[in-house]
From Swiss-Prot:
Function: Catalyzes a salvage reaction resulting in the formation of AMP, that is energically less costly than de novo synthesis.
GO cellular component: cytoplasm
Pathway(s): Purine metabolism; AMP biosynthesis via salvage pathway; AMP from adenine: step 1/1
UniProt catalytic activity: AMP + diphosphate = 5-phospho-alpha-D-ribose 1-diphosphate + adenine
GO molecular function: adenine binding; adenine phosphoribosyltransferase activity; AMP binding
NCBIfam families: PRK02304.1-3, PRK02304.1-5
Catalytic activity, EC: 2.4.2.7
Name this polypeptide is given: Adenine phosphoribosyltransferase
Species this chain originates from: Corynebacterium jeikeium (strain K411)
Length: 207
């Protein structure tokens, strides 16, 4: 005989009914996430090439407190939208997007780099500063996207090429990209100009 399932704990029940404090989207909450980000981020000069300052989010994601604040900050912003799916961009967008999707109770769609998925796929090519790249998502109706509202999440907005291509990819598949969220923006590269007709949320500015 299969044993009966234990009763759901009060703590588990409580987590389903979030308080107004959990949903707080005040400037103070946003500053807390940005502050935690600045305390943990690893700054690497001259990487990947001389003159470039690389801001590595790995220590931020590895620290449970900082990661929690970051995810809650992004999730609280997402609550302003009617979202069916979070689109996480390859690769750190997978980590952030999955956690945000879990927080919101929605699914996660991995937007993969070209060549990582079996056919059939929706595919888009886009230009980089020194070449081209591609993105893909499944195209066999395993993930119905027609009319779905998708919010895209990535770690950094630089030139805007990857986010712009991701939007094109999803819209070609019938989805509606309703907004974008990133942890850092390199404002000097003017990436937001390529995305100016979409709501964009940035946790903090790079540099």
């Amino acid at each position: 005989m299969r044993p009966a399932k234990p009763p759901q704990s009060k703590e588990r029940k409580r987590s389903k009914s979030l308080t107004s404090a959990d949903h707080d989207n005040s400037p103070q909450r946003a500053e807390t996430a940005a502050s935690a980000l600045r305390q943990r981020i690893r700054v690497v000069p001259d990487f990947p090439s001389r003159g470039i300052v690389f801001e590595d989010l790995t220590p931020v994601l590895a620290d449970p407190h900082s990661f929690k604040l970051l995810v809650q900050d992004l999730a609280n912003h997402c609550r302003n939208f009617d979202i069916d799916l979070i689109g996480g961009l390859d690769a750190r967008g997978f980590l952030l997007g999955s956690a945000v999707a879990y927080e919101l109770g929605v699914g996660i769609l991995a937007v993969r780099k070209g060549g990582k998925l079996p056919p059939p796929v929706h595919h888009v090519d886009y230009s980089l500063e020194y070449g081209t790249a591609s993105l893909e998502i499944p195209a066999d109706n395993a993930i119905p996207l027609q009319g779905k509202n998708v919010f895209l999440i990535d770690d950094v907005l630089a030139t805007g090429g990857t986010l712009s291509a991701s939007r094109e990819l999803l819209e070609n598949a019938g989805a509606n990209v309703c907004g974008l969220g990133v942890v850092l923006e390199v404002s000097a590269l003017d990436g937001r100009d390529r995305l100016k007709d979409l709501p964009l949320y940035v946790v903090d500015q790079a540099g």
